[in-house]
Structures are given as C-alpha cells and as structure tokens.
Amino acid sequence: MDTPSAAAETSEPSAQWQAYRGAPTGTDIECEGWRQEAALRMLNNNLDPEVAEDPENLVVYGGTGQAARSWDAYDAILDELRTLADAETLLVQSGKPVGVFETHERAPSVLIANSNLVGNWADWEQFHELEAEGKIMYGQMTAGSWAYIGTQGIIQGTFETLAELARDHYPDNDGLRGKIVATAGLGGMGGAQPLAVTMNHGVCIAAEVDEARIDRRIETGYCMERTDDLGEAIERATAAAEAGDPYSVGVHGNAADVLEGMLDRDFVPDVVTDQTSAHDELAGYYPSGYTVADADELRDEDPDAYREASMDTMARHVAAVLAMQDAGAVAFEYGNNIRGQVAAHRGDVTTTAGESHDPFDFPGFVPAYIRPLFCRGKGPFRWVALSGNPADIHRTDRAVTELFPEKDDLHRWIDLAQEHVQFQGLPSRVCWLGYCAADDDLTERARFAVRINELVDNGEIEAPIVVTRDHLDAGSVASPNRETEAMRDGTDAVADWPILNALLNTAAGADIVSVHNGGGVGIGNSLHTNNHVVLDGSDAAAETARRVFTTDPGMGVIRHADAGYADALVEADASGVTVPMRDAEREQ
C-alpha cells in the first residue's frame, strides 16, 4: 500500500503558495467580496509555515490532517474563490473543488465535506486506498475546514480541562501548583499542554519523539526547556514542584519508553495523559525502537510491520498510564482514541506490576471534566483578524472583557493569553463562550460577535474578523470515545446531531460550513462539523451572527437536554430554548 498523503507528496508546492507563504493581509482584496476573501485567507493561513506542521505537503496538524487534497486542488480552490460571486456557493469534496452553484447572497460561500465514508467502509484501510489514489483527503478537524490558528486553538481548552481537574482533585490547592503532569506529544495540538500546565501553576514533563517539535514549542513559548535525559527531567520537575514554581520540560523520547522509564525509577506523576497522534497507527504514532527517520523509512517500505510495531508500543503506553493510575496518579485520555486503538487491536493490557486492565479503565476528558460546559452550550469560540494587525485582536480582547465583566475566568484567560500566547499566522484569539441568553435574547456568542461587527463598522477594527470554532464543541460532534463518550442515555454513537448542526447552521447563513469524519480519533470513529461567519461591519453580517451564534450553541443545549442532562434542561429553561417532548423522566 502507498504511503498516506501520497497524492499530496507527489508534486512540488504550488507557486501560488510559495508566493503567499501565509495569508494575505491588509484591506485590499483579490476576491469579489470579503466573504470569499475570508475563505482565501483562512485557507492560506492554515498553510502558513508559522501555523502548519508540514505545509509543503499540505499537512496542517494531527499526523496527516490536510487543508487541500493536492497542490493542483489548492490552486483550483483559490482560482474559484477569486471569481466566486456573492450569490454562489463553492463545493469542496475532501480538499478538491468540485462545483459552483448559484444559491443566494446569504447562503454559505463554501460548503466542505472531508473524509466521509459510508459506515461499513469507514476504516483506515479503505481510506488509505482511496487516499493513495488521490480520491479523498483526511481533513482532521480544523485542517480541512480552514479554521486552524496554530497551537492557541487548543490552548484554552487544555487550560480549562486542567483547571477543572485541579478543582475536582485538588480543591484546596492553587490550581496545579506543586503538581507534576506527565504527558506526551508536542505537535500542533499537543504542543499546548506544557503552557496550559504552567498557566495553571503546575509542572509538566512532556515526551516527544521528534526533536524539532520540542524546539518549535520552545521557540513559540509553549515549553520552557528540553532534555534527552529523563532522569534530569524528573530532577528538574521535582525541584520546581517542591518550590511551587511553574515549569515545563520536553523530553526527547518515545512516549511509552518515557512513561516506563518513570515507573522504573519509581516516579509517579500526579497527573498523566497524552496527545500523541494515536488515532492513526500508521501516519500519526511512532513506534518504540526507531528514530523518526528510521520509522519513516519503515512506514514507506513495510506499512504492515509499522502498524504492528506502532500498536505494540501503544499497548505499552496505555499499560504505563494504567500502572500510574494504580499507583495514585490522576489519569485521563485527552481525545486521541489511544484507548480505543489498543482495545480494538490488542485487547486487555498488563502493567509492569502484573495487573490486567481493559484499556478503558481510565476515563476520557469530556465525561470527566468538560460535559457540564457542553450542557450550557459552552465551547471554543475563536476569531481571526483578516487585517493581519495584532491591534485588532487587542481591541477584541478589551471588547470581550467589557461585555462580560462578571466572568472572572474569562478575564484571567485573556490576561494569560496576552502574556503568554504568541500569534501564529493571522492574529487570533480563542475563548470559551456559551448560550446563556441575556435579556436582549442574544446568546453569549451572538452578543460578542455583534459587538465585533460594530467595531469593524465604526473603524475601530481595520478589516473584517472571521469567527469560527473547533469541531470539538457542545453540539457539533458524535465521537463515542471522546466528545460523546458515556452519554447519559447511551446515544454515544448517534450521528444525527452533527448532521443537524451543519444543516441548521447552513440554514442560518454561516459563510462556510463543513462536515468531517474521523478528526482526532481516526476514520470511522467520529462525525463533526464546523462553521465560519465573516463580520464585515454590515447589517447582513450582524443578522447572520445573531442567527448562527444562536443555532450553533443552541444545538449543544438541545443535544444534552435530549439526553436527559439536568444542566442542559436548566439552561434551556433559563434561555428560552425550545425542547419538544420533555417529560418527567427526562428531568430525573
């Protein structure tokens, strides 16, 4: 079988991409309007060398998550966007433009479907065969939907998860102060972990097999130091924890080897998790016993042998996490489906202490820490300054804190982000906002979006702002091993909800709507959606914002209300969300 992403690797990078090397900036546009221009800039921002993990191969993050199927497809998308009329919609099928239709001026400019296969065919083997033939692309989540903003995109979610963990497990502590978190994976998503730990005043030891990724996180301020010596890392981390100082160190090494090395030294961290690309055993996860270069060569020459070595390492990795949990560590899976991978391919694991475990004997992060937020429609809301001017984001920082003076956590987050988070590509910001309709009937997200639109209209912001989000959101995902794990009513695998989310946001007039399969957890394991709204200062943009930022978080409320979550039912009552067929059993 050919190597994954072969279609993207067979051609040199596009001359257009080499000319751009990131998104155009400023107030001059090359498209018919700002809605089309926003799509062009967001696509190019995804492939900015400051943003993407491997832009020359169209890979944005997450192993093989691409922004376009091939360089020819990338060029064709740009060509179509430049001539796309306000009343037309471009269709993109797995990173390739396949059609333009006349619709109407408030219809989406772009509709995207990535990586979707019919149920019985939705697995990596079938996907890789089609990918090698150039017929499909892995869009991950925000890679193929042109909404990735670099590591900042996940940083607040990681920060919030760890803050909730600290509240649950160390209620009398100052966050994670004095606690050591052991983790792995410092790619585009996992690279947020060290900074999220130190923002919570803790200490982080992060294993990463690729030295370049550690160095990149240090350069961007997400990780403090690196070492090849695990003993040295443990010594530094222990000293920092005892002093109560935030600290992070990247350890060059395989995740399983590093965790087992900790156990061999009788070192048990307070918290253990990981964000390796375990969702893809062939193109994402690296097996033990190989350098990166040697593993890449094995993948090319003998993919089956690579898979076996990768799965063997994953089983050891999970066994080490469970051994640490048995020894008192707080353990959770951070959404990469490593438990599901090991359960499917290796079954139960045995720890070094001889204990047998089901890989699912430690929880996922959503049921453990995030679901109460989802019940209130709260999730990762992000916005991007198309001007390229950081001052535009700084103005929105002030706006969001002015709008929500009562939200101490939000104010703390904005302060921390301004201090610690470097912009990658177009300046951007992320914060978690929810439904929580106010007296004016606007949700939190809608209130803020309308305010941004006013700032664009009155010239306080130089150029339009794109508002988008992660696919990981309250009502936009079906992922039984992640966002919808352990749903109260057993509807973990029901995929109607993200489909309804995409349909509803299309009806509400979002400027880009996308539907993907497999992001974060691998092909066949999830279905999820994304949307963009372009705030250009117009009355039409304000109306779109009011609609989309009501329907989108509202889907989170009704999805969880339908599953019987009391918090969601309370939110529905408080905010006037209509939930038909409510009965007494639902409110128990």
Swiss-Prot record:
<dbReference type="GO" id="GO:0019556">
    <property type="term" value="P:L-histidine catabolic process to glutamate and formamide"/>
</dbReference>
<dbReference type="InterPro" id="IPR055351">
    <property type="entry name" value="Urocanase"/>
</dbReference>
<protein>
    <recommendedName>
        <fullName>Probable urocanate hydratase</fullName>
        <ecNumber>4.2.1.49</ecNumber>
    </recommendedName>
</protein>
<feature type="binding site">
    <location>
        <begin position="62"/>
        <end position="63"/>
    </location>
    <ligand>
        <name>NAD(+)</name>
    </ligand>
</feature>
<feature type="region of interest" description="Disordered">
    <location>
        <begin position="1"/>
        <end position="22"/>
    </location>
</feature>
<feature type="compositionally biased region" description="Low complexity">
    <location>
        <begin position="1"/>
        <end position="15"/>
    </location>
</feature>
<feature type="binding site">
    <location>
        <begin position="254"/>
        <end position="255"/>
    </location>
    <ligand>
        <name>NAD(+)</name>
    </ligand>
</feature>
<dbReference type="InterPro" id="IPR023637">
    <property type="entry name" value="Urocanase-like"/>
</dbReference>
<feature type="binding site">
    <location>
        <position position="520"/>
    </location>
    <ligand>
        <name>NAD(+)</name>
    </ligand>
</feature>
<feature type="binding site">
    <location>
        <begin position="275"/>
        <end position="279"/>
    </location>
    <ligand>
        <name>NAD(+)</name>
    </ligand>
</feature>
<dbReference type="InterPro" id="IPR035085">
    <property type="entry name" value="Urocanase_Rossmann-like"/>
</dbReference>
<dbReference type="InterPro" id="IPR038364">
    <property type="entry name" value="Urocanase_central_sf"/>
</dbReference>
<dbReference type="Pfam" id="PF01175">
    <property type="entry name" value="Urocanase"/>
</dbReference>
<feature type="active site">
    <location>
        <position position="431"/>
    </location>
</feature>
<dbReference type="InterPro" id="IPR035401">
    <property type="entry name" value="Urocanase_C"/>
</dbReference>
<feature type="binding site">
    <location>
        <begin position="188"/>
        <end position="190"/>
    </location>
    <ligand>
        <name>NAD(+)</name>
    </ligand>
</feature>
<keyword id="KW-0369">Histidine metabolism</keyword>
<keyword id="KW-0520">NAD</keyword>
<dbReference type="InterPro" id="IPR023636">
    <property type="entry name" value="Urocanase_CS"/>
</dbReference>
<feature type="binding site">
    <location>
        <position position="208"/>
    </location>
    <ligand>
        <name>NAD(+)</name>
    </ligand>
</feature>
<feature type="binding site">
    <location>
        <position position="140"/>
    </location>
    <ligand>
        <name>NAD(+)</name>
    </ligand>
</feature>
<dbReference type="GO" id="GO:0019557">
    <property type="term" value="P:L-histidine catabolic process to glutamate and formate"/>
</dbReference>
<feature type="binding site">
    <location>
        <position position="334"/>
    </location>
    <ligand>
        <name>NAD(+)</name>
    </ligand>
</feature>
<feature type="binding site">
    <location>
        <position position="213"/>
    </location>
    <ligand>
        <name>NAD(+)</name>
    </ligand>
</feature>
<dbReference type="InterPro" id="IPR035400">
    <property type="entry name" value="Urocanase_N"/>
</dbReference>
<comment type="similarity">
    <text>Belongs to the urocanase family.</text>
</comment>
<dbReference type="GO" id="GO:0006548">
    <property type="term" value="P:L-histidine catabolic process"/>
</dbReference>
<keyword id="KW-0963">Cytoplasm</keyword>
<dbReference type="InterPro" id="IPR036190">
    <property type="entry name" value="Urocanase_sf"/>
</dbReference>
<dbReference type="GO" id="GO:0005737">
    <property type="term" value="C:cytoplasm"/>
</dbReference>
<dbReference type="GO" id="GO:0016153">
    <property type="term" value="F:urocanate hydratase activity"/>
</dbReference>
<dbReference type="Pfam" id="PF17391">
    <property type="entry name" value="Urocanase_N"/>
</dbReference>
<keyword id="KW-0456">Lyase</keyword>
<comment type="function">
    <text>Catalyzes the conversion of urocanate to 4-imidazolone-5-propionate.</text>
</comment>
<dbReference type="Pfam" id="PF17392">
    <property type="entry name" value="Urocanase_C"/>
</dbReference>
<comment type="pathway">
    <text>Amino-acid degradation; L-histidine degradation into L-glutamate; N-formimidoyl-L-glutamate from L-histidine: step 2/3.</text>
</comment>
